[in-house]
Amino acid sequence: MKHRTIINIFTGLALAAAVAVIALISIILTGKSHLYNAADRIVQGNNCDGDKTNEAVIFNREPYVYKKGLINILILGIDGEGNLYDNHSPGDMGQSDAVYVVSIDTQSKATHVVGIPRDTMTTIEMSDKDGNTVAVNTGQVTLQYGYGQDIQQCTSLMAKSVSGILYNIHIDRVVVLSVNSIAIINDAVGGVTVTIENDFTDESGEVLDEAFVKGNTIHLTGEQARLFVQERDCNVAESAMDRLSRQEQYMQALEQLLYKKVRKNPFLIMKIIKELKSNDMLYTDMTNAEIVYVFFR
């Protein structure tokens, strides 16, 4: 009887594991289908601003055309410590201090990340409290996010601006993270190791952390991670570019670590997403299946 019970337990565990694997495969395939369909649709169509994506761009007298089968995901990091879903007057919705486009090649499976400096000058649409465009000016791309009526319009305006900066590429999906999300993501993967390339302080000139000394290699935990990717001295020229370099270093290290962790535990990414969403630190139009596929493609 005892032997039979043990066999039943192992059989049950094996069935549960098989069901979990099948469910995971189903999720991955669903995510793949959704993203591939998005990539296929825009090859024949227009970008988010209605401009053709298949027209040649001339650079150094050489013509370049949009490559087929790319999935472009816009990632925005928003300053301020408030709720991403809080509605404010247009112009007060915050600024996007981190602007990145992650481009996934569905043919080669390669991933390319393009960081756009927050101070890049572009066309900025300003809207009223009803979401209607009332003015179009030239300004820093970081400002565009703040002129939406709500988070959906904020991200739509940013997608349009970034698309224009990058020769009208199509933006397929958007991921928006509040600055407070960094500590949660960082600690969920056990911390991220970085090297301090330059000394930096906040705008008051105070040292943010004793470990933030040029040349130090440190393992960031919690609040350290947020300080590393967010803070800069606004009174120092090129401090925004220095911060962009830190953000890129952090993102590369985090991507590699998160990829390894999620491959071992597929449900980790779902746990992180659930915590971020429950605290209103994440907005995205990606489905859970699409997010899981990104890590298992």
List the predicted regions and their residue ranges.
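Non-catalytic, solvent-exposed segments at the cell envelope interface
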Residues: K2-L15, A20-R297
